[in-house]
Amino acid sequence: MPVEEPLATLSSIPDSSADQAPPLIADEFTLDLPRIPSLELPLNVSTKHSSIQKAIKMCGGIEKVKEAFKEHGPIESQHGLQLYLNDDTDSDGSKSYFNEHPVIGKRVPFRDESVILKVTMPKGTLSKNNNSVKDSIKSLKDSNKLRVTPVSIVDNTIKFREMSDFQIKLDNVPSAREFKSSFGSLEWNNFKSFVNSVPDNDSQPQENIGNLILDRSVKIPSTDFQLPPPPKLSMVGFPLLYKYKANPFAKKKKNGVTEVKGTYIKNYQLFVHDLSDKTVIPSQAHEQVLYDFEVAKKTKVYPGTKSDSKFYESLEECLKILRELFARRPIWVKRHLDGIVPKKIHHTMKIALALISYRFTMGPWRNTYIKFGIDPRSSVEYAQYQTEYFKIERKLLSSPIVKKNVPKPPPLVFESDTPGGIDSRFKFDGKRIPWYLMLQIDLLIGEPNIAEVFHNVEYLDKANELTGWFKELDLVKIRRIVKYELGCMVQGNYEYNKYKLKYFKTMLFVKESMVPENKNSEEGMGVNTNKDADGDINMDAGSQMSSNAIEEDKGIAAGDDFDDNGAITEEPDDAALENEEMDTDQNLKVPASIDDDVDDVDADEEEQESFDVKTASFQDIINKIAKLDPKTAETMKSELKGFVDEVDL
């Protein structure tokens, strides 16, 4: 017969002494107590019988409460308990509030059983301790005058977590009062009077109804149309749906206390939110950042910083580097600049970028930094700087093998392997997975098939908001090649199907469903106009190769052209961009000194490291332990040869 282990043990707090008291086995008791339900109301309910009765009445009565406790199934399918906060009625029996709707309470899905305790203490103990139960119990801790008795167990609870909505009264609306006195009263004479008061032929139906016959005793402004209020004003049921962000500059110490070091200045980065023809491209920085920079030139201290931080000197050095970079390349992605700007002056880069560049928040150049005065819509030479976003699907990333193949992103500050240029690991060449999947077009043409498509591109006469200077078909070709090769590489396959790549390069239509039935379709959409008099495609024309012919002759399955191979292209979500670029916050931290800034950057780099224990090697785990406990890591390294997966034990 197996021996049962104790449910709990009581032991002394470990100290430095070698002799410790042996652990004491705790006494175990069975609580044979009644189970009772609990109703947590957002009301001030007293112990008086009338107060409890009123609370139950606001919930629809005791039967409604019982029905709510008996509900089963997922919380989404429960009807819940309706709590009417303003269930008042007027003297005529009608509702006081228009469309008064209740707050819905539902059963807690995870039942955490609570024990109700009856605490007995000598009379007058509470008054001696300022009516504090906690202090009263503490004062009787060492005496035998305190008695605690378990009474019952709460195992079923209904809570009201929704917000109460705004409630509306229509007492001061004449048309509402007339409607209420007629239809609301259900009196025939009132009905008849109301109907007769409405003109048969309204010569001015657009006028306020208050200007007609209805209750002329009340003056109503012509702007008050007396429209019925919306049935619900608050569109959010729970007060938790907000994008909370912790202070990125707050550091938590070992004792758990969070501390914010340094001061903060605003970078005043200029954004352009519209791509219409009327949009004027900025030619200089925000007036406030220009003013601050002029003050810094005179005083040698940037406003909001301290002189010993040397922020202005670092800013001047950063500006010199960025001006040279923007002279060579007018449009940049910030992550590319992170590897070029030296670590010691990197903290000034947001201010420097605000002084020499602006940003689009939409369109083909979104989230890039563009030199002031440069309008990428003005010339096709800026087509190569358009951005494309790619993403590995979650179903692939759930595989440990794929996770291991995907490269770790670079730290916040790093050193480019190309001095003064974009790190080669940001470029897509079909031979390795790039660090960052927000790719500019000119970083894709290192792949031969994409280069072939790019060099045969016929640009549009005018850039548009969706595809920029490119025709949609050309962008689709590039995207399909990237998605196919990217999906192969993350799965460890670097041998591509040449027939698939050939098909992608010679695609005639954006989608197979867009094959036109006539030759008058739009130019630039890959329309096959090479048809004879009967409308049949001329199969002898080599330049117009049928996609079906490629599939059948070269063994490409019918659905392969729709397979993204585990990689997708889409609009970037805001959260991903904020986490990756870290440049959407207008507030910039200014370190107290240069040394403080270097320490902060190192801490950020450590936080950015991604560590997965399922795919990490023995050495990776040892290195991780060494950061916390070097001595233990050294012992494990010398005594162990490796770890065994728990599934193999």
From Swiss-Prot:
Composition-biased stretches (Acidic residues): 560-584, 594-610
A GO CC term attached to the entry = nucleus
Query: Under the GO molecular function aspect, what terms does this record hold?
Result: DNA binding
Which stretches does the entry tag as region 2 X repeats, Pro-rich? 221-419
Q: Which residues carry this modification: Phosphoserine?
A: S617
What does the UniProt keyword field contain?
DNA-binding, Nucleus, Phosphoprotein, Repeat, Transcription, Transcription regulation
Q: Where is this region: Disordered?
A: 1-21, 556-612
InterPro entries named among the record's database cross-references: TF_IIIC_su-5_HTH, TF_IIIC_Tfc1/Sfc1, Tfc1/Sfc1_N, TFIIIC_tauA_Sfc1
| Source organism, top-level taxon | Eukaryota
Look up the record and give one Gene Ontology term from the biological process aspect: transcription initiation at RNA polymerase III promoter
Q: Where in the cell is it found?
A: Nucleus
Q: Where are the sequence repeats?
A: 221-239, 400-419
Q: Where is the composition biased (Polar residues)?
A: 9-19
Which is a Pfam family this sequence falls into?
Answer: Tau95_N
Q: Where is this motif: Nuclear localization signal?
A: 296-300
Which family is it part of? Answer: Belongs to the TFIIIC subunit 5 family.
Role description: TFIIIC mediates tRNA and 5S RNA gene activation by binding to intragenic promoter elements. Upstream of the transcription start site, TFIIIC assembles the initiation complex TFIIIB-TFIIIC-tDNA, which is sufficient for RNA polymerase III recruitment and function. Part of the tauA domain of TFIIIC that binds boxA DNA promoter sites of tRNA and similar genes. Participates in the interconnection of tauA with tauB via its contacts with TFC3 and TFC6. Serves as a scaffold critical for tauA-DNA spatial configuration and tauB-DNA stability.
Print the miscellaneous field: Present with 15800 molecules/cell in log phase SD medium.
Q: What is this protein called?
A: Transcription factor tau 95 kDa subunit
Source organism per UniProt: Saccharomyces cerevisiae (strain ATCC 204508 / S288c) (Baker's yeast)
Gene (UniProt): TFC1
